[in-house]
Amino acid sequence: MTCDYTQLANNGVQQLRPYQPGKPVEELQRELGLRDVVKLASNENPLGPSHRALEAARRSLDQIHFYPDGAGFELKHALADNLGVSSDRITLGNGSNDVLELVARAYLQPGDEAVFSEYAFAIYPLVTLGCSAKPVSVDSHLYGHDLA
């Protein structure tokens, strides 16, 4: 017996299409005969990680077999101190996709509309559909966002 598990997903998830990433640098170099290419798409840093981040990662290698503090106590308090706010005003996530999905799940009901600019982050319509809400993309006005 076979089962089409995609039919079990909510209607919003059924409307999602797989992400199509940009071309790898190597493919672009081959296609266009280029040697030096700086990739600015896909939210990647062409400069690489900072030396301080690499050093912090090296110092932590002997602890990678442990789960980190899921509440991010130290990070939340350091950010709160730096920003001059209470730590309970800080929400941490695994990147902006994760935080935007948390917000969408908390506030969007099936059938709600989520309004965003045509140039908004690509995750907005995806998390909206995933919550069975309706994504509404609006045109930009004079190179800005007018969501009124």
What is each model feature region?
Residues 2-66:
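N-terminal "arm"/small-domain region of PLP-dependent enzymes with the aminotransferase-like
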Residues 65-148:
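Conserved core of the PLP fold type I
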